[in-house]
Curated annotation (Swiss-Prot):
<dbReference type="GO" id="GO:0006388">
    <property type="term" value="P:tRNA splicing, via endonucleolytic cleavage and ligation"/>
</dbReference>
<keyword id="KW-0507">mRNA processing</keyword>
<feature type="binding site">
    <location>
        <begin position="127"/>
        <end position="132"/>
    </location>
    <ligand>
        <name>ATP</name>
    </ligand>
</feature>
<feature type="binding site">
    <location>
        <position position="63"/>
    </location>
    <ligand>
        <name>ATP</name>
    </ligand>
</feature>
<dbReference type="InterPro" id="IPR038239">
    <property type="entry name" value="Clp1_N_sf"/>
</dbReference>
<dbReference type="GO" id="GO:0031124">
    <property type="term" value="P:mRNA 3'-end processing"/>
</dbReference>
<dbReference type="Pfam" id="PF16573">
    <property type="entry name" value="CLP1_N"/>
</dbReference>
<protein>
    <recommendedName>
        <fullName>Protein CLP1 homolog</fullName>
    </recommendedName>
</protein>
<dbReference type="InterPro" id="IPR038238">
    <property type="entry name" value="Clp1_C_sf"/>
</dbReference>
<feature type="binding site">
    <location>
        <position position="22"/>
    </location>
    <ligand>
        <name>ATP</name>
    </ligand>
</feature>
<comment type="function">
    <text>Required for endonucleolytic cleavage during polyadenylation-dependent pre-mRNA 3'-end formation.</text>
</comment>
<dbReference type="InterPro" id="IPR032319">
    <property type="entry name" value="CLP1_P"/>
</dbReference>
<dbReference type="GO" id="GO:0005524">
    <property type="term" value="F:ATP binding"/>
</dbReference>
<keyword id="KW-0547">Nucleotide-binding</keyword>
<comment type="similarity">
    <text>Belongs to the Clp1 family. Clp1 subfamily.</text>
</comment>
<keyword id="KW-0067">ATP-binding</keyword>
<dbReference type="InterPro" id="IPR010655">
    <property type="entry name" value="Clp1_C"/>
</dbReference>
Length: 428
């Protein structure tokens, strides 16, 4: 039975956890952080081990689960919305899944020829813990000495970079408990929306492009090849959402699909792929918190703020003017027009991935811009990765300049910029 302490407590609290027990914690909103210290035993947070007697700081609104396999004692100081223990946790099932994937990696290791390790896709509706399960599986793999690739197709949260982006990252160390996986040198593409719905064709095109790059990495890196990849997906699982799941599963040649919570999706995918793909149905954790639309918006804003200022506000972004004449601004996707108005031989799908020049206006204020890695228009800007992001803080049409917030000082490394529908108001 769960024991709960539901009070915004400021005092220092100690918790003693028995083996196979989880302490679920929600830090209160506001301006006070919570500090967690492992006093004895062993414990982990989403697959990353806690270091004994080290202070870990969690920001207001943080939600985490401290799990122990053998038992432990932890101390928490700071304002908590909720803190309770539970022995009803799917962690043993998640560990069994990891061990099955590890056996696949061992088989791939033994082949002298290049043998692909597990390509795992985690799917399910919103708020079932997909990102957490992906983080667990990746952390466990890295702790075994593997080098898996983390693939993020969830444009709503954008854990590979910023919301509205898709990407992949080769992992060499477990996620930092406070800051997550190190995002040095990720492969990132701009989708530009927080849901796949505005542009299914572009979403599928970028999924396929990332899959191609991942397989190229597998060919060059035998360790990464045997380690495989773990793919996080959006929480849309019906209609177009289901179609993009199937497309991504095919593009990445997935051999394991983990379905969290929803039996209907599990059965649909079993019928779709038959015996070609192992479909695994797992329960969601009881600690998963349902997020409101407002909460999701706040998380996206915090993600963008962290990109420019750092998780602990330890980065100092640069603000400077950029002349309109020094850059070329585009957006991906032209407005839909009646089929009768399209040029001969063209379909609506081509409009969805068309590169459209953008004339700077006051509407650019607060917009997120991606810096394309392309050096000329002869390259396909739509399918070229991006190397960074800017936010437009001001637009001066008389002087033909815009003031941007940038992680790096001037000058800009490239001149081709892609417009996103994501907006960020920098009140720092």
């Amino acid at each position: 039975m769960d024991t709960e302490q539901d009070a915004k407590s400021e005092e220092r609290q100690q918790w003693k956890l028995e083996k196979d027990t989880e302490l679920r914690v929600e830090v209160a909103e506001g301006d006070r952080e919570a500090i967690i210290v492992l006093l004895s035993g062993n414990a982990e947070v989403f697959g990353t081990e806690l270091v004994k007697n080290k202070k870990f700081t969690f920001r207001p609104g943080s939600k985490l689960a401290i799990f122990t396999w053998q038992g432990c004692s932890v101390e928490i100081q700071g304002p908590l919305e909720v803190a309770y223990k539970s022995k009803e946790t799917p962690m043993v099932m998640y560990l069994n899944l990891h061990m099955a994937l590890e056996q696949m990696r061992e088989r791939a290791d033994k082949h002298e020829a290049v043998e692909l390790g597990p390509r795992v896709m985690v799917v399910g509706p919103t708020d079932v813990g997909k990102s957490t399960v992906c983080q667990l599986l990746l952390n466990y793999a890295v702790r075994m000495g593997r080098r898996p690739i983390s693939v993020d197709l969830d444009v709503g949260q954008g854990t590979a970079s910023v919301p509205g982006s898709m990407g992949a990252l080769l992992l060499e160390r477990p996620a930092d408990i406070e800051e997550g996986f190190s995002l040095q040198a990720p492969l990132v593409y701009l989708f530009g929306h927080t849901s796949p719905s505005p542009n299914e064709k572009l979403y599928n095109m970028l999924s396929s492009k990332i899959a191609d790059i991942v397989f190229q990495r597998f060919e060059r890196n035998k360790k990464a090849c045997a380690s495989g990849c773990v793919i996080n997906t959006c929480g849309w699982v019906t209609g177009m959402g289901y179609r993009i799941i199937v497309h991504a599963a095919t593009a990445f040649k997935v051999n394991v699909i983990v379905v969290l919570d929803q039996e209907r999706l599990y059965n649909d995918l079993k019928n779709q792929f038959g015996d070609k793909v192992q479909i695994v149905h797992l329960p969601k954790s009881g600690g998963v918190v349902v997020r409101s639309r407002e909460t999701r918006r706040k998380v996206r804003d915090e993600r963008l703020r962290s990109y420019f200022y750092g998780q602990q506000a330890n980065l100092y972004p640069h603000s400077f003017e950029v002349k309109f004449s020094d850059v070329k601004l585009f957006k991906i996707g032209a407005p839909l027009v009646p089929d009768s108005c399209l040029p001969l031989g063209m379909d609506q799908g081509q409009n969805e991935t068309k590169l459209v020049p953008v004339v700077p206006t006051k509407d650019l204020k607060h917009c997120l811009l991606a810096i394309s890695a392309a050096e000329s228009l002869e390259e396909d800007l739509v399918q070229t990765n991006v190397i960074g992001f800017l936010v437009v803080n001001e637009v001066d049409l008389d002087r033909e300049v815009m003031v941007v917030l940038s992680p790096a000082p001037r000058p800009l490394p490239r001149k081709f910029l892609l417009l996103s529908e994501i907006k960020f108001m920098d009140f720092k």
